[in-house]
UniProtKB/Swiss-Prot annotation:
It comes from Ehrlichia canis (strain Jake). This is Argininosuccinate lyase. It is found in: Cytoplasm. GO terms for cellular component: cytosol. Pfam families: ASL_C2 (PF14698), Lyase_1 (PF00206). Keywords: Amino-acid biosynthesis, Arginine biosynthesis, Cytoplasm, Lyase.
Amino acid sequence: MKNPLWGGRFTTSSSDIMKKINESISFDKTLYEEDIAGSIAHCKMLVNQRIISKYEGQLIIHGLEVIQNQISSGTFEFSTDLEDIHMNIEHNLKKMVGNIAGKLHTARSRNDQVATDFKLWIRKSIVKIEHYLHELQDTIINLAESHYNTIMPGFTHLQIAQPVTLGHHLMAYFEMFKRDFSRWQDLYKRMNQCPLGSAALAGTSFPIDRHFVAQELGFYSPTENSIDAVSDRDYAIEFLSNASICIMHLSRLAEEIILWCSYNFKFITLSDNITTGSSIMPQKKNPDAAELIRGKTGRIFASLNQILVVMKGLPLAYSKDMQEDKEALFDATNNLMLCIEAMNNMLSNIIINKNNMLKAAEHDYSTATDLADWLVKNLNLSFREAHETTGQIVKLAEHNQCKLHELTLEQIKTIIPSINDTVFSVLSVENSVASRTSYGGTAPTNVIEAIKKGKAYLSNIKFSQTDKNNI
């Protein structure tokens, strides 16, 4: 049987292998709500413009609503012979209303149809991701507030560097996710133009009203160029770029969770409901959720790379290669939302082992920078001189197998005779942390202010939206 929608100039039907490689219904049926919403808006416009009759429009819209209910309830039968979601819906619409169904495709192509569907789906997904991120940020800021003065080691090169507060460390991730949130908002604004009415690539000679359709579907405006509208997927690439940055931030936090719950750190304890055991080692409690977030990061990165490679060599306008844009994006979206939710679950039930964090912060001469700063402020040394002198004092402590504050004044004077006993005030991790009051620093007073600002931000946040986000 020849294809009922495009088989007019063909004398034979597609081979089985052609049908197999050509079909996309196995994955683009995900777009059924968006496809039907776009078709209803297009149908209303055709009626308004008197391209089809009001009666025909009513029949078509009723049929589309019936099909939507069938798909939602699981009673609709998809066919790979009909290639994609568009043709499956139109074929079944024809069964209901007859040849009138064919009038729905007046002044449109599957090229602008799928671009519209895809934008609607991405737009809806952006709003979902924003809500997931908002919940995660709320969990992070509440945890930071509970530990605004909990001292832990700060690291560079995964070596203990300087003492910081856990609250400050957590607020670093809050800021990362805040920027992620703004990227989703920016994308929503940039992509929210409607391709429908661009037809195959050149527009149409029918007297359509693209502004009506755009408004009906909640877009800010129609796209400005019909070729651009059907031939680019930069919004999908940007979506996956945002997803990649966001999952990268999640992966870094997941990596720290994995480290922190290990025997070597013992900074945290994860809840039983977000960990797993071993089939052979009864004592194991594995941070599998964190590891899977870290692992799924590569999967999302690959999705971005996939669509970049698909698009990089395509001449204008549409090519069938672009059918390969959806599976990767659907997969990345589902996994990103799952990972955000899993991270939120982990942090909501985490136990912080404060004493272990404090003890670790006191190791590896973490207040050496404070000592160097004291030498600059009190003995008028240049920072380079103070750095050299402090290094010698650290070496002395290593030789004596003690911490900096355990050295005697007499021992330190063998390095720098002009030093006095007030230096010991800066060698405790508590004083070190309290002194870091520069804007954005780790002092508990700063963390409290950062949390206040963060809470105000969360309470005033505006999610990307139109009055059609349910489409």
